Amino acid sequence: MARGKNVELSEYERKRQENIAKTQALLRNLEMEAAEAGLGPTGKSRAAASSKPRVKKPAPKKIKQEDIAPRRTSSRLKGIEADSEKAKRKAEDEYVAIKEADRAKRQRVSDAFNFSDIVVAGKDWNRSGNFLSIGPANPYERTFDFDDVKETTDKELRALREKMSGLQLWEDFEPNEIKITPERIYAMGMHPTTEKPLVFAGDKLGNLGICDASQKVAEVKQEDDEDADNEGPTITTLKPHTRTIHTFQFSPHDSNALYSASYDSSVRKLDLAKGVAVEVYGPSDPNEDQPLSGLEISKDDANTLYFSTLDGRFGIYDMRTPSDQAELFQLSEKKIGGFSLHPQQPHLVATASLDRTLKIWDLRKISGKGDSRLPALVGEHESRLSVSHAAWNSAGQVATASYDDTIKIHDFSKSAEWATGTALTDADMKPSVVVPHNNQTGRWVTILRAQWQQFPQDGVQRFCIGNMNRFVDIYTAKGQQLAQLGGDGITAVPAVAKFHPTLDWVAAGTASGKLCLWM
């Protein structure tokens, strides 16, 4: 047949070629759609990895965690028929066993611990591990900056603002490198020593993280080595409690003694010199659930422990006696979020409660019988929403933070003159200063609390409080803002903030267990 001659196609051949054309068109459309969606093969292979070997960090020492939960077993292998009475009993027994295991995991342990027994992460505790040896928020939007400092006309106030605003984050490590606790931080504090910054933090699961902030970067980072791993500081993590550590305090009588209060219903004393943690208070019935929301040791008596509970009770306990000898007073029908003793007049107690009140109590006069036995109520002030904490300073002022988005400062500077049985009027209880402040922490951020510096060296009373825009605010007792501390590497709200007792060092913790430290 001549090559150029037209040939009439059969009906079958024509149909076959139409089907081929349709199939090819469909394939082309699919390829185009895949390319637009980014599913097709890339034109270039990934760049070859750098020939420079990457230094691997040594694997951290793993501590075996014992699982106390019962193991599931196969009913079929045991010959138990499905839906039989025997199978139902087996399922019920397994459910009870799992619930009991969960309860046992959360129940407090009353035994004394050596620190080496409760280290869960970081450096092992030994002689060298005693750190006391000398060796809606708008993230990052400032509400106080250096322009406010420059515009200050009062010379003394301006000097103080310049000083406090000049505090800098720990230069050796960024906050996102300093994971001081495994879980959300609830309590923060700095050891009273002035030799070096020694930071403690308590978290949601009962861990206590300890960071010696005098340590330096172990390895100098090479500028051209972008792949180098950033190692954080050495952290030691103890687990003295089985549930949230809500509050802790260094004893005013012994700086080696740290007292911690927990939702596991216990108070423990950690002896930092001996490396031992012992329970000093807990309900006499080990099954009683009495979560604690605060504790304090008076400067006048090293043996008396004051504490508050989430069910509105306030306790006084002589630690030399059995725990059932503790005096308990029902000061509120709702949760007491925090309390404090007047530093100079420790018979005066300020409580903040979910019932929206700040109340001042006088422990010198206790009257009534049974459940009605109470200290004398000096006065109370009601806010629009719940009050999270009440903190005395040594000048007789009380700072509170509440969900009505305010910080209130109440002036009771004449409290040293109050006779037993003094009753204040509503006008006397009104705050002298009200500072607008966003306190809407929500579910995932620890409640903001105003915390005074115990012994300011210049005599100017000041407190710090976390800021929802990822800063820490510092105010005077007159409500004047001194600084808004921030910096690079702060990726969450530093909600739990605390001053060093005497030095201008501020430590703050986040919901991810990270530490921010300004010095």
From Swiss-Prot:
InterPro entries in the cross-refs: WD40/YVTN_repeat-like_dom_sf, WD40_repeat_CS, WD40_repeat_dom_sf, WD40_rpt, WD_repeat_DNA-damage-binding
Record PROSITE patterns: WD_REPEATS_1, WD_REPEATS_2, WD_REPEATS_REGION
Function: DNA-binding protein that binds to both single- and double-stranded DNA. Binds preferentially to UV-damaged DNA. May be involved in DNA-metabolic processes.
Key words of the record: DNA damage, DNA-binding, Repeat, WD repeat
Repeat positions for WD: 240-280, 287-327, 331-371, 380-420, 442-485, 488-519
GO molecular function, one term: DNA binding
Disulfide bonds: none
SMART domains linked: WD40 (SM00320)
Family the UniProt entry places it in: Belongs to the WD repeat DDB2/WDR76 family.
Protein name, per record: DNA damage-binding protein CMR1
Region annotation Disordered: where it falls in the sequence: 35-92
Signal peptide (UniProt feature, chain positions): none
GO cellular component, one term: chromatin
Gene Ontology biological process terms, A to Z: DNA damage response; regulation of DNA damage checkpoint
Residue spans of biased composition, Basic residues class: 53-62
Bias kind Basic and acidic residues: ranges: 78-92
One Pfam family hit: WD40
Gene3D superfamilies per the UniProt record, alphabetical: YVTN repeat-like/Quinoprotein amine dehydrogenase
